[in-house]
Amino acid sequence: MRYFDSSRDTLTADHVMASAALPPAFPAVRIDGEPYWDGGIYSNTPIEAVLDDEPRRSSVIFSVQVWNPDGPEPQSVLDVLDKQKEIQYASRSSQIEQQRKLHRLRHVIRELSLHLPPEIAALPEVRDLSCWGCGTTMHVLSLVAPRIGDEDHTKDIDFSSIGISARWQAGYEEAQRMIASRPWESKVDVIEGVALHTLPPLVK
C-alpha cells in the first residue's frame, strides 16, 4: 500500500485514475513505472495514514463508507455477491480500534511525563521516551452511505448519470447531518485521544 500526498508528491491525473482503478473493470495505472489499483481493495479506510502523519496535530477526520454492510440476510446468489462486495469495501472497525489504542498509549506516555520530577524529566534517556507521547485529539466522523433503491453487486461499476447523482445526493445529505451535529465540539477524555462519532440511521 502506497500513500500519495500532495504535500510531498506532485499529483497528476494518473494518481486520480489509479485511485479509482477497481479490478477487474479497470486496468492498473502506472505511476513511476509501477502499476497501481484502487487502494480500497486493500484498505478502504487507511486511518493510520492520518494518525501517523508528522507533525501530528489535532484533526477532524471524515471516514466515508460508500457501501453499507448492514441489511437483511442474503436470499439468493446475487444477494450474496452484493453482500460480499459490501463487506469487502467496508471500513474495518477493528482497524480503527487498534489505532485508538495506539493513540491512547501516546496520551498515557504524555500524562506520565507531566508527573515526573524535573530532575528525572531532564535526563536524556527520559526525554527520548517522553517524545513518544502526544496530546492531540482526533475526532473520527464515520459516514455510512444509505442504501439506494435497487442496487446490486454491480453498483461499484455503475457510472450512469442517475446512479452517480443519487450517490452524490445521499452522501451530501449524510455529511450535512454529521456537520449539523458538530460532534468535534464534544469533550474527549484526556487519556483517549481518538473519539469515534457515528450517526443514528435515518428512519423513513
How should each PLM-predicted stretch be described?
Residues 1-204:
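Patatin-like phospholipase
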